Amino acid sequence: MIKAFAALEAKKGLEVFEFEAQPLKPNEVQIKVESCGICHSDLSAIDNSWGASKFPMVAGHEVIGKVIGIGSKVSLHKIGNRVGLGWHCGYCNSCEHCNLGDHNFCGSTKKTVFSQHGGFAEEVSADEVSVIPIPEGVKLEDAGPLLCGGITVFTPIVEFDINSSHKVGIIGIGGLGHLAIQFYKALGCHVTAFTNSNDKNDLLTSLGADEIVSSTDSLSIKALGAQFDFLISTVNVKLDWNLFLNTVKPRGRLHFVGAVLDPIAVSVFSLMGGRRSISGSPVGSPKNITKMLNFCAEHKVSPMVEHFSFSDINIAINKLRANKVRFRAVLTW
């Protein structure tokens, strides 16, 4: 039996839960979980905020561990390898998107949390393609959040060819934003951080922010003018998007990685007049996760993490709910 922590019903604390391991399919890998990050998406799964949860719900999709079993057709991994597993645990591996390496666009993706029991467990299984080797130079104990939060803010770098000539603005400096600062600064970009917290300035400067602007000070934001080549929003709250859009240069882009539930109201004239673009993206493909991890190893990018024992999982979750974690929570067995 595999020990796990599960929500037995929505919006309740997690309890010890045991389930039987299923036989590995030919293309699957069995991972002994050593640590697992807690993401706000896990809270959404536990609370059934999206209406897709099935109970008992074993969440967790920022897994770091060791390969302890491989299916008969597995060729990408060996027993003992240190690996990570993120939001997706499987793909069809035969559609147009998978064949192009864009597995995250596959119409038959399997979710680590919703398609099976996730990483808040002693073991988890996944399609070998979704299991990512962890390179030397990446701190294993802190790496879990890179598999979701990290790739979420790294993917636009690849998709839009962000480089050192670009001025970048980052809206929201939390679990996603603090990683975004590090990534974009490591590229050589001029980075402006937008935050509603007055107590983070020294920290944001140490992470690489060149300028810090209050995200609630409309006059200061307006005074920036149209200066950003790329403006990325990591928040899930409603803001004055026209105000922020007007800080984007002609041909620039406002990109969303935070899941704002309210409709985004923007002026079409602001888009047309400057040929500005609005876009969004979630997580990323296995190839881009690998690229991101290598980038982290080279540039010493690492999440700021608070560590908790799995036995304290409810303490960690409640602290995350209260927005008191700086900046990511990671559970270890």
Please name every model-derived segment:
Residues 2, 286-333:
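C-terminal hydrophobic helical "lid"/dimerization subdomain
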Residues 22-36, 49-96, 130, 135-138:
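Glycine-rich beta-strand-centered segment in the early N-terminal region that forms part
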Residues 91-171:
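NAD(P)H dinucleotide-binding glycine-rich loop of Rossmann-like/cofactor-binding domains
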Residues 164-173, 185-241:
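Adenosine-nucleotide cofactor-binding segment
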Residues 177-178:
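N-terminal Rossmann-fold NAD(P) dinucleotide-binding loop
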Residues 248-249:
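Helix-to-beta-strand junctions that scaffold the AdoMet/dcAdoMet cofactor pocket
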Residues 252:
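Glycine-centered, small-residue-biased loops immediately flanking beta-strands
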Residues 259-274, 286-292:
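Rossmann-fold NAD(P)-binding glycine/threonine-rich loop
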